[in-house]
Amino acid sequence: MASYSVTVSVAGTSINKYPAGSAGFDLAMADSYDPGKQHARRVAAYLPKQQGLIYLPGQQTVLSEDSDQDRPFKQRRYFFYVTGVVEPDCHVTYDIAEDKLTLYVPDFDFKRTIWTGPTLGKDEANQRYDVDRVEYFSALEGDVLRWSQANPSLSIYILHPDQRPVTPLTVAYFYESKSLKHAMDACRVIKDEHEIQLIQRANRVSGAAHRSILANLHHFKNEAQIAGLFIDVCLSLRSKGTAYQTIAGSGSNGATLHYTRNNEPLAGRQMVVLDAGAEWSCYASDVTRSFPIPSSVSGGRDWPSREAEQIYAIVQRMQEECISRVKEGALFFSIHQHAHAIALEELLKLGILRIPQGSTKADLIKAEVTALFFPHGLGHHLGLEVHDVSPDSGTIPVELAIEREKGLMSVTEHRPPCTLSAPPLASGMVITVEPGLYFNRLAIDQARAERDEPNSKGRFVNFDVVERYVDVGGVRIEDDVLVTKDGNKNLTDAPKGKEMLDLIYGR
């Protein structure tokens, strides 16, 4: 389709929001296919019995504490998976034996309709969604009661014990909350063609936003302008927004993995790490690009320093080689290890790492010294959540369980595919491949302080050399990759490498 260009003037600065080469697709295009019932059938096939009732609540409207304003709405992903419904205050049941999907929409509220417009009604829901029956919410309790009376020995499958559709009174309901999540996760981790198209659409919006930022980077003075333009382009292209909080970290902020303040000036800094992805129809993209700040570059060069260019080249090599290894049957943990092997080789070449007298390269590997500069996993599953479900998400490592108990981790955290116990990659999985190298002052100073301790990482670090790289901050490059039977398909089209530099410098 033909690309288009929209020029916006802000405070005397001309910004071309959609530069040539950005994703110029039909904004009026609608997502006409709803695979909700197909997904419900897939889930049912994974349950222990091919009889029973599945119940899932959608996200309800919730007010912020001590406020009359609604919290930002985000549809519950498990509910969306079997309905495709994006509106709030809905519920769904699926009678497995009868193959009947019933959607419950909010009861009509005259006052609410006057103030905020009509909620999803029965006729509209019947036209828009692939369901067998639509009822108002007030019918839910009676329907479940009658189903239970007719099927007294069958289970009602729910995700969590606190998500019961009816409080047991006169009927002995058999609620089963152990099987449904495992079944849904097993289905969600393998994307069908419709889901892949939605993830690719999200990536196209992300690509357009990243292009716009690169083309207009020379106008910007603050991280906030980068983050703001990304959201602007996403909304303009009919995305509901971003799939997660945008990370626009300049200078040392780029060494903080999930930096989201996005409010500091760009002046005097070399690089920006921009981790920002659009959402499309509840499906996420997750894209990271690292690029030089034009005001820090002089003399016709592309990079603000030799150190920045070197680190970018290493991360680029890490990503390219790792993506080439993604295929059905591969162990992502092994690909993750390959990324660390490249980091070790290259950091030794730069003199950032060293092999002390009496030590060997194997000692550096055993000490996991590269984790000082590459402290996160190579990637994660992607889908309805940016950190999407895994096939074995019901169990998590002990150390993660401890973090969850401390309140440091959501209870919905899923096992990443780069753990040793994760199953091999399978066709239909979508994963991120996001190697990075970071020069985090806190981590470096701690390693320096502990360098004389046995088994410390600092023993293998040349801290004088490291200081030359601290101003780089960090570099991360991230793409969303579909695993296929023949290898993989990269779903991300945001510029990187030479194409990225050409956009920044208008070449």
Curated annotation (Swiss-Prot):
The keyword Metal-binding applies. Mn(2+) 1 binds at D286, E434, E478. Its EC number is 3.4.11.9. GO terms for molecular function: manganese ion binding; metalloaminopeptidase activity. Keywords: Aminopeptidase, Hydrolase, Manganese, Metal-binding, Metalloprotease, Protease. Catalyzes the removal of a penultimate prolyl residue from the N-termini of peptides. This is Probable Xaa-Pro aminopeptidase TRV_02643. It comes from Trichophyton verrucosum (strain HKI 0517). The lineage of its organism: Eukaryota, Fungi, Dikarya, Ascomycota, Pezizomycotina.
